[in-house]
Amino acid sequence: MRDQKALSVRTVVAIGIGTAILFILKRFAVIPTGIANTNIDISYGFLGFIATLFGPIAGFFIGFLGHALNDFTQYGTPWWTWVFTTGLVGMVIGLFWRRFNVEAGNFGMKKIVSFNLLQIITNVVSWSLIAPTLDIWIYSEPANKVYVQGIVSAISNSIATGVIGTILLVTYAATRTRSGSLKKES
């Protein structure tokens, strides 16, 4: 008998559907920033939302696969350092899914602030430091180019996640029945 718990059907379905939605958003719902290969990308708001609902494994694979599919279909080959970093962003945000517990129907101001602090720190570290450094090590890209791209991405992804992700989480939580809200009538 297996000691490890396999991925649930719910998580696998979330990965499949989430990857498809992320791919569509990355492909068709972006605004160019004027910096090469850098966009204002609302898919990061969706990734923050879906990672908060389904956890780190789903967050990683949705980010990784959705970004890889977009790069493959748009450019012919994935830019693996940024694909990995997108997966990492989804995973880190997903690590806190139990803390946010959106399924309980409560995503108030305290959780909104916590979510946004988490996603800003995650986006800044991931896009300003990790992705550009990997670009230099793996692809021998010029440092000034990739760090500018990374900083612009950190800012735009933080804003997109802060606005879109927060709206999605608050709206979703409002559709859930709050725990303890149902009372037996006398």
Curated annotation (Swiss-Prot):
Top-level taxon of the source organism: Bacteria
GO cellular component: plasma membrane
Transmembrane segments: 12-32, 45-65, 77-97, 112-132, 150-170
The keyword Cell membrane is assigned to this record: yes
Database matches in Gene3D superfamilies: 1.10.1760.20
Annotated membrane topology: Multi-pass membrane protein
Location in or out of the cell: Cell membrane
UniProt keyword list: Cell membrane, Membrane, Transmembrane, Transmembrane helix
HAMAP family per UniProt: UPF0397
Protein family per UniProt: Belongs to the UPF0397 family.
Protein name: UPF0397 protein LCABL_04350
Organism: Lacticaseibacillus casei (strain BL23)
